[in-house]
């Protein structure tokens, strides 16, 4: 009976360790996904700015060119 208790305890202990490691990896993955989403949003905002600035420059240049 004692060996059965020891075996059961060992199985439960290893199961908890395994579960703990899996949960830690999930948390790290979620953090990485959050950082990746923020980086993608920042990249999209910068590319929108890059598309907008030449348009704005040509518009201002056109207005200044017509007044001269």
UniProtKB/Swiss-Prot annotation:
Tissue: Expressed by the skin glands.
Compartments, as annotated in UniProt: Secreted
Keyword Magnesium: no
PTM annotation (Leucine amide): residues: 64
Feature: compositional bias, Acidic residues: 30-42
Key word Lyase present: no
Cellular compartments per GO CC: extracellular region
Region (Disordered) location: 24-50
InterPro entries linked: Frog_antimicrobial_propeptide
Highest rank taxon of the organism: Eukaryota
Signal sequence coordinates: 1-22
UniProt-listed Pfam families: FSAP_sig_propep
Listed GO biological process terms: defense response
Residues that make up the propeptide removed upon maturation: 23-51, 68
UniProt keyword terms in alphabetical order: Amidation, Amphibian defense peptide, Secreted, Signal
Bridged cysteine pairs (disulfide): none
Similarity field: Belongs to the frog skin active peptide (FSAP) family. Brevinin subfamily.
Name of this chain's protein: Preprofallaxidin-5
């Amino acid at each position: 009976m004692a060996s059965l208790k020891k075996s059961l305890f060992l199985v439960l202990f290893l199961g908890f360790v395994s579960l703990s490691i899996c949960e830690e990896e999930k948390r790290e993955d979620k953090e990485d996904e959050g950082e990746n989403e923020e980086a993608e949003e920042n990249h999209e905002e910068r590319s929108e700015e890059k598309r907008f600035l030449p348009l704005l420059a040509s518009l201002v240049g056109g207005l200044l060119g017509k007044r001269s």
